[in-house]
UniProtKB/Swiss-Prot annotation:
Transmembrane segments: 31-51
Domain of life where this protein originates: Eukaryota
Protein name per Swiss-Prot or TrEMBL: Transmembrane O-methyltransferase
EC number(s) from the headed UniProt entry: 2.1.1.6
Record keywords: Catecholamine metabolism, Cytoplasm, Deafness, Endoplasmic reticulum, Hearing, Membrane, Methyltransferase, Neurotransmitter degradation, S-adenosyl-L-methionine, Transferase, Transmembrane, Transmembrane helix
Catalysed reactions, semicolon-separated: a catechol + S-adenosyl-L-methionine = a guaiacol + S-adenosyl-L-homocysteine + H(+)
Molecular function per GO: catechol O-methyltransferase activity
Subunit structure: Interacts with LHFPL5, PCDH15, TMC1, TMC2 and TMIE. Interacts directly with TMC1. The interaction of TOMT with TMC1 and TMC2 is required for the transportation of TMC1/2 into the stereocilia of hair cells.
GO CC terms of this entry: apical part of cell; cytoplasm; endoplasmic reticulum; membrane
Any Gene Ontology biological process: sensory perception of sound
Cross-referenced SUPFAM superfamilies: S-adenosyl-L-methionine-dependent methyltransferases
Positions with a binding annotation for S-adenosyl-L-methionine: 137, 139-140, 145, 163, 193
Length: 291
């Protein structure tokens, strides 16, 4: 006859030792008690990161989370809300007062991600020093830096500004005209910089840009600089200014400018508007010529 089966409380079988339910469930109970301990072990690291990068977290909240929420609730973009504020608080025909109003709105209401007063002073000083006959701005955004350049242009100076987004360009156009600058002095072109640069000479009668401001997407800076070179739009001695070269950063652009041998480079260190602890800067390049 075969080996008899023995039935016991738990797990039983032929020749198997008795295993109680408590013993079987014991590892599951141990795993459950270890999770809080692991979480507590990571708590100091999380706190350290939050403290160290608190400025970046605040920036993320203001530029992404709160902005997206207000976009959904209002049905308007941040540039459109900013322009509505300017209409009710700024003096028409006074570009300085309009700029101050935008700064106040960005600091006290919604963060605008604009150039801000510190970088703005650097930009205006350089435009006044260089006295360019023609300026090309790539990245109009809300028109803040456009007003800065237009204020500092010499008599008879001309500014062409390029914005790829039609809705943003419409806001910038209204702001520029509200400040008192007409189309002969400030011309806004709607289109991507990649498409507009090859057409500047033929369609917009721009044979040379004495000063260029790159203020759109940092990852496009190198491409657009090389396009300007390829179409011979930079005369010897031309100044190229590039915003946001440290944050979010344009490393390939800076590496090219420093290594190609055609530019003298200088970096103006600043912080972000309302976030001075987040380091940024404006690159100033002086073009020596193609040779």
């Amino acid at each position: 006859m075969g080996t008899p089966w023995r039935k016991r409380k738990g797990i039983a079988g032929p020749g198997l030792p008795h295993l109680s339910c408590a013993l079987v469930l014991q590892p599951r109970a141990q795993v459950g008690t270890m999770s809080p301990a692991i979480a507590l072990a990571f708590l100091p690291l999380v706190v350290t990161l939050l403290v160290r990068y608190r400025h970046y977290f605040r920036l993320l909240v203001r530029t992404v989370l709160l902005r997206s929420l207000r976009d959904c609730l209002s049905g308007l973009r941040i540039e459109e809300r900013a322009f509505s504020y300017v209409l009710t608080h700024a003096l028409p025909g006074d570009p300085g007062h309009i700029l101050t109003t935008l700064d106040h709105w960005s600091s006290c209401c919604e963060y605008l991600s604009h150039m801000g007063p510190v970088k703005g002073q650097i930009l205006m000083r350089l435009v006044e020093e260089k006295a360019p006959a023609c300026v090309l701005e790539l990245g109009t955004y809300c028109g803040y830096s456009t007003l800065l350049i237009a204020r500092a242009l010499p008599p008879g100076g001309r500014l062409l500004t390029v914005e790829r987004d039609p809705r943003t360009a419409a806001v910038a156009e209204k702001l520029i005209r509200l400040a008192g600058f007409d189309e002969h002095m400030v011309e806004l072109i709607v289109g991507s910089s990649e498409d507009v640069i090859p057409c500047l000479r033929t369609q917009y009668q721009l044979s040379r840009a004495d000063l260029v401001l790159l203020a759109h997407r940092p990852r496009c800076y190198l491409r657009d600089l090389q396009l300007l070179e390829a179409h011979a739009l930079l005369p010897a001695g031309a100044t190229v200014l590039a915003d946001h070269v440290l944050f979010p950063g344009a490393p390939r652009f800076l590496q090219y400018a420093k290594s190609c041998g055609r530019y003298r480079c200088r970096l103006h260190h600043t912080g972000l508007p309302d976030f001075p602890a987040i380091k940024d800067g404006i690159a100033q390049l002086t073009y020596a010529g193609p040779g």
